[in-house]
Amino acid sequence: MIIRFRSPVGMHRVRCEGSETLGQVLPQLQTILNEHGITPRAIELGKEANGKDKTNVESLLEKTIEALGFRHGDIVYVHYQVDSSETKGSANDNNGSVAVNIPNNLVPGKSQKADELEVDKELEKLDGLIPRQKTKLCKHGDRGMCEYCSPLPPWDANYANENNIKHISFHAYLKKLNESTNKRESGSSYIAPLSQPNFKINKHCTNGHEPWPKGICSKCQPSAITLQQQEFRMVDHVEFQSSELINQFIEFWRASGTQRFAYLYGKYEKYDATPLGIKACVHAIYEPPQHDEQDGITMDMEQVTQELNTIDLLAKEMGLLRVGMIFSDLTDAGNGDGTVLCKRHKDSFFLSSLETIMAAQHQTRHPNVSKFSEQGIFSSKFVTCVVSGNLKEEIDIASYQVSIDAEALVSADMIGGSTHPSMAYINDTTEDRYVPEIFYMKKNEYGLTVKENAKPAFPVDYLIVSLTHGFPKDEDTTTQLFNSVTGFPWSNRQAMGYSQDYHELKRYLHSTAASGNFNDLHDKLANFHLLLYIHSLQILSQEEWELLVKGALSQDYQEPLYKLSASPGWQTLLMIIESA
C-alpha cells in the first residue's frame, strides 16, 4: 500500500505493507525529509491538519500500519521540530510540536556535526588581495592608488595566467562565488554559495509516479552532465617534511622490485605561493598490510579498514590526519644506472581510469567540512601521489586530486575502468542507476571550444586536478614532528625481511633509554612507527601513553619524559626489552 505523508515541505508517498511496524516505515520518511535539507529532532503524526490529534512517534514505533488504522491512500499529517540554526526562518519554527528524541537507528545517514579545519577558519578571515606595485601608468603620488596599482582579487584570471596557476585555490574560488551569490547591496537573505553535486536518481520522488525503474519524471532524474576542467583545487601543494620519507618508501621497490601502496599522515596549512592557498604537509607514511606484485598490489580491505581505524585514532592523538595516499608505479629501465621507464606522460596517461575511480572513492570517504555548502560538506582535501618515472627517466612524484564531478560520477556508479587507461567508460542504465546524457567540452582543430558526447568513453583527464609538490627549502632548520624516519623498521615490511619485535626495539632504544639522556631519548622516540609499535604492545597505560607522545613530539619534553621514566609501565617495558 501507499501512505501519503503531508509535511510543511510537501506530500511524500511511502510504500509499505500493512504488517510492517511504523518503526520500519519511518526511515523512508526520514530519508525524504533529509533530501529536502531537513533533519528533524522530533516527529509527531496525526490525521488532522490542525494537529489536534498528533502523537509522538516514540509511542507508536512498535505498532503495525494496520493496527494504527492506516489504509491505502490515507493522508497522515507530519509535524516536526528542527534546530533553530537549520530552519533559516522557515514556517517550521512555529508548528508547536513538543520535542521528542528520535532513535538514531531511525535516522539514516545522520552524523554529528564536524568542525571545519583550522586552516579554513584562518583563510576565511583573510581577503587574499594580491598587492601590486606602482607602474609607469600611475599618475599619482606614493600614497595614492589607481586602477593600475590597486590590489587584485585572489581569483584574478590575468594574474593566474601570468603566474602559470592552472587552478585557483579553493578559498579564492569560494570568495569569488560568494561575491556574486551574496551581493552586499542586494540586501537579500544569505544563500550558501557551494553545493555538493548529486548525480543519483531520486528514488523517493513525490511527483505522483512509482519510483525508478517503474517511473521517472524530469524532477527525479538527473540533468544532462557537461564535464570540463575544474577551475579550482581544494589543495594547492603537497609538502613532504623530509626527503627521507620518500626515499624509505621507494626502498621497498629497490629491494623487491614490486610496487607499494601507503597512506599519508600530516596536517593542512596555509600555502603562501598561491593566493589563499592550502598545502598538505606530510609528516609520516603508513603502509597497510598488502601483497605486492610487479604490476600492482592486493589487499584485504576488511583487515586494512580495521587497522586504519586504530592508526587514525593514534595519529589524531599526535595531531595528524590522514591527508592522502601514495603508490609506486616503477619499472627499471635496464641500463644499470638507476633509471626507470617513463610510463605516464601527456601522450599516455597521468592517472588511469581505475586510479581515478579509486581516488574519487577515497575523497568521498574523507569529505571536506564547509559551512558555506548547502550540505555542510564540499569535495575533499584528500590527495593522491604517484611515484613513477619522469621524462628524464628519473624517479619523481606527481600529485593529484580528482574533481568534484568525478566524486559525484563515482558515487552514482556512472563510470568504470576501460582497457585504455586514459579513458573512462560510461556505464549503462540499469534498474539501480539512471545514466543521463554526458558531454565534455574540448577544443577542436580550429581552436574553438565545442561540446562532445562522452559516450561510450571520454578522456579521464577531464576529472583530474594537478597539484604541485616539494620539500621544505631547508630541511635542517624546518621543525619536523618526527626527528627519526629510519632506524626502526616500518610496519608491515616482513616481505623485506624486517619485522617489528622486541629484538629490534632493544637494538633501537635500550641503550638510549638506559643512559638517562632525555635529549637523545626524545630524538629516538620521535619516530612514527616506533610509537605505533609501542602502543600495540599494550604495556603502557593511557596516561603513560600520553606522556610518551608528549615527550616524543613536544618541544618541551623534559618534564613528560621524566614522569614517563619513573612510571611502572615504562619500567616494565625496559625490563622486557632488556631480557629480549
Curated annotation (Swiss-Prot):
GO CC aspect terms: endoplasmic reticulum membrane; nuclear membrane; perinuclear region of cytoplasm
InterPro entries named in the record: MPN (IPR037518), Npl4 (IPR016563), NPL4_C (IPR007717), Npl4_Ub-like_dom (IPR024682), NPL4_Zn-bd_put (IPR007716), Ubiquitin-like_domsf (IPR029071)
Gene3D superfamilies attached to this UniProt entry: Phosphatidylinositol 3-kinase Catalytic Subunit, Chain A, domain 1
GO molecular function: ubiquitin binding; ubiquitin protein ligase binding
Domain MPN: 238-378
Region (Disordered): 86-113
Keyword annotations of the record: Cytoplasm, Endoplasmic reticulum, Membrane, mRNA transport, Nucleus, Protein transport, Translocation, Transport
Main localization of the protein described in the UniProt heading: cytoplasm
Ranges of Polar residues composition bias in the record: 86-104
GO biological process, one term: ubiquitin-dependent protein catabolic process
Similarity comment: family membership: Belongs to the NPL4 family.
Summary of the function given for this chain in its UniProt record: Involved in the import of nuclear-targeted proteins into the nucleus and the export of poly(A) RNA out of the nucleus. Has a role in the endoplasmic reticulum-associated degradation (ERAD) pathway.
Protein name (Swiss-Prot/TrEMBL): Nuclear protein localization protein 4
Organism: Candida glabrata (strain ATCC 2001 / BCRC 20586 / JCM 3761 / NBRC 0622 / NRRL Y-65 / CBS 138)
